[in-house]
């Protein structure tokens, strides 16, 4: 099995797009691996954006405090909560509420599968179609990292042109409908298009290559 960050480390990357940056811990890894690359991040949760800015993550990436979806404007964002101490792998998780499961989609089966995670609040956040993000117009994307908790189809629906210019795509998926209207892997692959082939299925995440880009 290909270790995803070792795979990324070996690539020549000029432009890296991270969709769903959370606290920016992966962002920091990407910057360490590729100090000269352009890193463009999207994170809609105001709580997470505050953590990123406090840690200075916005100093080494282009941070957009917005969600990516299939429309431009504003959108409802369901904010997760919970005691992350049992699962904490770093100080950021230990010191903050569990915001990792927040989504543009309403949680459904997620509430039964992960009972310790709640969704007590929601927020109206800015949203955009990736195809309409001005700073990425016409840009070749060497690697796109997507972690959006069940809202993958919304991201991809608004990114059809950008995906044609994207060489590698790494996205989370789930074959259970944990969020309302969540698509499974087969449905996501159909939406993304036949130009992407599966390089490695991690069972919850999948690495894809655009064979015509």
Model-assigned labels for residue ranges:
Residues 1-213:
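Phosphate/nucleotide-binding beta-alpha loop and adjacent structural elements of enzyme active sites
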């Amino acid at each position: 099995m290909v270790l995803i960050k070792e795979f990324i480390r070996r690539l020549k990357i000029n432009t890296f797009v991270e969709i769903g940056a959370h606290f920016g811990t992966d962002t920091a890894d990407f910057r360490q691996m590729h100090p000269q690359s352009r890193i463009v991040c999207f994170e809609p949760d105001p709580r997470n954006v505050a953590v990123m800015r406090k840690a200075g993550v916005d100093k080494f990436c282009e941070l957009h405090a917005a969600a990516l979806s299939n429309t431009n404007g504003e959108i409802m964002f369901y904010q997760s909560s919970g005691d992350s101490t049992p699962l904490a792998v770093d100080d950021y998780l230990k010191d903050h509420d569990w915001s990792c499961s927040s989504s543009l989609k309403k949680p459904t089966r997620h509430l039964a599968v992960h009972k310790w995670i709640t969704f007590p609040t929601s927020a109206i956040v800015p949203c955009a179609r990736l195809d309409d993000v001005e700073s990425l117009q016409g840009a070749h994307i060497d690697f796109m990292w997507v972690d959006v908790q069940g809202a993958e189809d919304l991201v991809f629906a608004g990114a059809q042109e950008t995906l044609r210019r994207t060489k590698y795509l790494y996205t989370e998926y789930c074959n259970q409908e944990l969020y309302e209207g969540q698509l499974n892997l087969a449905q996501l692959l159909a939406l993304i298009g036949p130009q992407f082939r599966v390089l490695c299925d991690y069972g919850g995440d999948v690495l894809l290559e655009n064979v015509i880009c």
